[in-house]
Amino acid sequence: MGEFNEKKTTCGTVCLKYLLFTYNCCFWLAGLAVMAVGIWTLALKSDYISLLASGTYLATAYILVVAGAVVMVTGVLGCCATFKERRNLLRLYFILLLIIFLLEIIAGVLAYVYYQQLNTELKENLKDTMAKRYHQPGHEAVTSAVDQLQQEFHCCGSNNSQDWRDSEWIRLREARGRVVPDSCCKTVVAGCGQRDHAFNIYKVEGGFITKLETFIQEHLRVIGAVGTGIACVQVFGMIFTCCLYRSLKLEHY
């Protein structure tokens, strides 16, 4: 009877080992995906980040990059702990899983909270940022972001082309009589912003506030979904780890 129980325990341990190994392979790939999403958020349209008053969006992306890197290291550690049957490594592995789980939950919550606040933040800050920082010394990133937004999303101004009347740059001599930046033009040539002509200036209502809000919200949905989804999958990893740890403890005795 004792021999039967021992074989049963050993068989269960072997099954758990292979199950946890398979999980760790998938977990490593998931870590790569999480890190890729974080890097994608930072790299793709990174100039737009300079237009945001809050650092929440940036913090969320950095958390994902860090979490993804730690996940990949943890996946390798999990494979070593599983096949070497070292309970101390399994304990460390479980603690790392728990830390990553909390990081991804935090990233998901930050993404959700910022998603709710985004519209208010853009309306309160973007027009003022555009008026006071566009083409001003030390704010080249803002200038580049605004020009890129207007050309890519075919719009002019934060709400409409009239917003540029409040621009400090427009009132300066270096603007050379422009009423809007050249990036507002459908066909961009030097000095085309000197005439607010209906046929060559984008007149889309809603301006780039609406476009930028939609763009960032799409990114936040991806960040929130990836962070929360993989965090939920990690629960299974922690359960498998606890089961294997307990099984090794029983075999030890």
Curated annotation (Swiss-Prot):
The alphabetized UniProt keywords are: Cell membrane, Glycoprotein, Lipoprotein, Membrane, Palmitate, Transmembrane, Transmembrane helix, Ubl conjugation
Where in or outside the cell it occurs: the entry states: Cell membrane
Give the glycosylated residues.
N159
Q: Report the PTM annotation.
A: Palmitoylated. Palmitoylation by ZDHHC2 regulates CD151 expression, association with other tetraspanin family proteins and function in cell adhesion.
Q: Which Pfam families match?
A: Tetraspanin
List, alphabetically, the SUPFAM superfamilies matched: Tetraspanin
The residues that cross the membrane are 19-39, 58-78, 92-112, 222-242
Which residues form the lipid moiety-binding region (S-palmitoyl cysteine)? C11, C15, C242, C243
KW Metal-binding (keyword) present: no
Q: Which residues are exposed on the Cytoplasmic face of the membrane?
A: 1-18, 79-91, 243-253
Query: Per the UniProt entry, what are the Gene Ontology biological process annotations, in alphabetical order?
Result: cell migration
Instruction: Look up and give the membrane topology term.
Output: Multi-pass membrane protein
Instruction: Provide the disulphide bond pattern.
Output: none
- Spell out which residues lie on the membrane's Extracellular side: 40-57, 113-221
- Spell out the molecular function terms from Gene Ontology: integrin binding
Example GO CC term: the record gives: plasma membrane
Family matches, as CDD domains = CD151_like_LEL
Subunit structure, as described in the record: Interacts with integrins ITGA3:ITGB1, ITGA5:ITGB1, ITGA3:ITGB1 and ITGA6:ITGB4 and with CD9 and CD181. Interacts (via the second extracellular domain) with integrin ITGAV:ITGB3. Interacts with ITGA3; this interaction modulates ITGA3 glycosylation pattern. Interacts with F11R. Interacts with RAC1 and CDC42; these interactions mediate physical association of RAC1 and CDC42 with integrin adhesion receptor complexes.
Q: Which family does it belong to?
A: Belongs to the tetraspanin (TM4SF) family.
Function, please?
Structural component of specialized membrane microdomains known as tetraspanin-enriched microdomains (TERMs), which act as platforms for receptor clustering and signaling. Plays a role in various cellular and molecular mechanism through its association with both integrin and non-integrin proteins. These interactions facilitate critical cellular functions, including cell-to-cell communication, wound healing, platelet aggregation, trafficking, cell motility, and angiogenesis.
- Record's protein name: CD151 antigen
Give the organism's phylogenetic lineage: Eukaryota, Metazoa, Chordata, Craniata, Vertebrata
> What gene name is given for the protein in this entry?
CD151
